[in-house]
């Protein structure tokens, strides 16, 4: 069994799924759920459903057995992110395959967000410098709140 039983959307989990049903879901089904979670909570950006689902499948495949998907979101440039209790994982579609990048919570010093009339941005102050992630303006505040909570819990 892969990480399927533990890759849960912890907060705002869909009511129609119980624990046993989630444990039986395949990576593709979990990736679709992650995409629709991001879409329904205005955490989506410039990626098609097909591209986002493929990226989420790549992320789910590398997750540890004890990790859960706490916050899946998609940047305005089509990069897919998943925040877990341990780290922030980013997947980017390249010409030949996918590129996965990870940042542990101890590498991120501060998390901010900024909204304008047309777009939102998550700003991560990391040990490597400032990282800006363009997101939907309506979901930036919620995403920032969840990321801060995960960072605080990881201490």
Q: Where are the regions a protein language model picked out?
A:
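Anionic N-terminal interaction surfaces
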Residues: 7, 12, 17-81
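Acidic, Ser/Thr- and proline-rich intrinsically disordered linker/docking segments
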Residues: 17-19, 99-155
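Short, surface-exposed beta-strand/loop "edge" segments at domain boundaries and coil↔beta transitions
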Residues: 39, 43-44, 81, 89-90, ...
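Phosphoinositide-binding peripheral membrane targeting modules
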Residues: 72-80, 85-119
